Amino acid sequence: MNVNHPSLSFEVFPPNTAAGTANIKETLDRLQALNPNFISVTCSNNKSNIEETTLKLAGYINNTLKVPAIAHLPAAYLNTQQVTRILTELDSLHIHQLLALRGDIIPEVPRKDDFKYASDLIRFVHAQKPGFKISGACYPEIHPESPDLVSDIRYLKQKVDAGCNQLITQLFFDNDRFFTFKENCALAGIKVPIIAGIMPITNRKQALRLIKTTSAHLPKKFLAIFDKYEHDPASLRTAGLAYAVDQIVDLITRGAAGIHLYTMNHAETAINIQNTIGSLFNSSAQLNN
């Protein structure tokens, strides 16, 4: 990876309505024009239906739009037979990249027993398809279920040792915490690229949900934007986008390997960021299909 030209990538999720399906194709057409390094596709809430949701959308991205696609696989909801079938399907779609996760634990969705942790899934995929590029998730501010920082970094090292080629962070809003995390990874011998996951906050509903549910630290500057513009949608959008742009520029300047935008299936914010600071990124995909 050329550190002077870090990657730019996007995350989308499979829609569950007809209107959502129409919207996602329009969104993806617009994201394609930004020449991302890759687009990742999350799992739907019905995690047993990955072939009809995640893989179908990833196939469209990879083969129709000609943008490298990464499919999310949740370890907790898959068994070895399913993963073997999914890997075969990915091969047929010419997709040789995936993001291995444990997956959020949803009480109403039955878990499987084959892969307790993401590292178990990574190890299995690496053995079955050693040519696949495997991404893993990481938490700059510690996984909510980890007992402490040392344990969290140790578990992350296990993912990398199992065959993980790069890491993508959960969203965060305090860059200093990201770089402290990056230093801790280096001290632990974690040498794979760490891509920063960024979610621009551009509307009141999104901000309120984030404030209530996130474990990420919200800096005073971020909270001040919401306090001042909570009931002014246009100004909140402008200020939220400016915050994200400042965050991204700082990350790139200080050596982040790449930026992964959580788009929420909307292209406007990504387009605005590309128009503002697009020259800081690679102009074409670096990850090989």
Predicted regions and their residues:
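Conserved, mostly hydrophobic/aromatic
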Residues: 11, 39, 90, 159, ...
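Glycine-rich anion/phosphate-binding loops
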Residues: 23, 75-89, 112-117
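Active-site mouth loops of central-metabolism enzymes
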Residues: 7-23, 69-81, 135-151, 228-242
